[in-house]
Regions:
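Class I SAM-dependent methyltransferase Rossmann-like catalytic core
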Residues: 4-26
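C-terminal helical/coil "lid" or tail adjacent to the Rossmann-like core of SAM-dependent
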Residues: 8, 14-15, 199-257
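Conserved alpha-helix/loop element of class I SAM-dependent methyltransferases that forms part
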Residues: 24-44, 58
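Class I SAM-dependent methyltransferase SAM/SAH-binding core
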Residues: 46, 52-104
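A short acidic, Gly/Pro-enriched loop at the edge of an enzyme's catalytic core
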Residues: 104-113
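A short SAM/SAH-binding and catalytic strip from SAM-dependent methyltransferases
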Residues: 112-127
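A short glycine-rich, Lys/Arg-flanked "PGG" loop and its adjoining helix->strand segment in the class I
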Residues: 127-142
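Conserved catalytic/acceptor-binding region of the Class I
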Residues: 144-211
Length: 270
C-alpha cells in the first residue's frame, strides 16, 4: 500500500467484502441523507474514501445522466473493485480515482456535493479531510458526513469479554491517532471548516438476532487482532478466551446489541 495509507481497518480481502456488504446495509440511511440535502439532477458530486462501492450508485442515480460523480480511494485493490462494480452495473456517470483523502488533487470549488461515510472514524487527522472536502465544493455547495460514535455500542446483559476487548481496541486506536467517538464532533468540524447552516441527524439501531451487523464489533477486533497483540494490549490466550465468550453471547437471542451512535451532519459553503 501507499506509504501514507493510515486507514485503521486495513485493506484485506475480508475488509473489502465487509465494506461491500456495508454499502447495502447503509444504503437506505445514505439515501435519506441525500434526499434531505436535495442533490439535483445534473449535479457534480465527489465521494471521499468510497472503498469498493460506497455510495457511488446512490449518487449516480441522483445526479442522473447529465451529472457526474467522482470516487476517491487510496487502496488500489478497492479502486479496482469499485471500477468492476460500476462496469457490472453499467454505470457511466461515475469515475473512481486513486488518491489521498486529505490531498485529492481534484480541482477546487468544482463540486456541488462532497461526502464521506465512515471514513473519519478510521483516519488520523480527520480535520485535514474535512478541510479538503470544503475546498472541493463551490459556493453554495454542501459537505455531508456520516460518522460513528462508539459510545452507544454495548450489549445487554453486559459481558466482561466485550468490555475487555473494547478497552484493548480503544487503547490501540488512541495510540494510532484514531478517534472512535468522532461522530459527536463532526458538526463542529464542519463549522470550523467554514461551513454554515449545519444540520445534524442521529441514527441508532438494535441489532437483532440474524441482523447482518450484529457481529460488527467481533469483526473489528478480529480484523485488528494481530496488531492489538503486537502492542501487548492483551495476551493471545486472553484474546482467544474473550472472542469465544463474545461469540457465545452474541449467539443467544436474548442478548441485546445496540449499534454505534451514527451521526449524519451536513453544511453549506457560503
Amino acid at each position: 500500500m501507499a506509504h501514507d495509507d493510515q486507514y485503521f481497518l486495513g485493506h484485506s480481502s475480508v475488509e473489502q467484502r465487509r465494506l461491500q456488504q456495508q454499502a447495502g446495509e447503509l444504503a437506505e440511511e445514505s439515501a435519506r441523507l441525500f434526499d434531505q440535502i436535495g442533490l439535483a439532477q445534473g449535479s457534480r458530486a465527489v465521494e471521499i474514501g468510497c472503498g469498493p462501492q460506497g455510495c457511488l450508485e446512490l449518487l449516480s442515480s441522483r445526479v442522473g445522466p447529465t451529472g457526474s460523480v467522482v470516487g476517491v480511494e487510496l487502496s488500489d485493490h478497492a479502486v479496482q473493485l469499485a471500477r468492476e462494480f460500476l462496469s457490472e452495473r453499467r454505470i457511466k456517470n461515475v469515475e473512481v480515482r486513486q488518491g489521498n483523502a486529505a490531498a485529492t488533487g481534484l480541482p477546487r470549488e468544482r463540486f456541488d456535493l462532497a461526502t464521506a461515510r465512515l471514513v473519519l472514524v478510521n483516519i488520523p487527522e480527520p480535520e485535514k479531510i474535512v478541510a479538503e472536502m470544503a475546498s472541493l465544493v463551490r459556493s453554495g455547495g454542501v459537505v455531508a458526513l456520516h460518522e460513528a460514535d462508539w459510545s452507544a455500542h454495548v450489549c445487554d446483559p453486559p459481558l466482561p469479554a466485550w468490555d475487555r476487548l473494547k478497552v484493548a481496541l480503544v487503547t490501540y486506536s488512541e495510540q494510532k491517532g484514531i478517534d472512535l467517538y468522532i461522530g459527536r464532533r463532526i458538526a463542529r468540524m464542519l463549522r470550523n471548516a467554514g461551513l454554515v447552516d449545519v444540520q445534524v441527524h442521529p441514527l441508532i439501531h438494535i441489532y437483532a438476532p440474524n441482523h447482518s451487523r450484529r457481529p460488527i464489533f467481533l469483526q473489528f477486533v478480529n480484523n485488528l487482532r494481530d496488531r492489538i497483540l503486537a502492542e501487548g494490549l492483551i495476551s493471545e490466550a486472553e484474546f482467544a478466551e474473550c472472542i469465544a465468550s463474545l461469540e457465545g453471547h452474541l449467539a443467544k437471542p436474548e442478548t441485546l446489541v445496540i449499534s454505534h451512535l451514527f451521526i449524519q451532519a451536513w453544511g453549506r459553503k457560503p
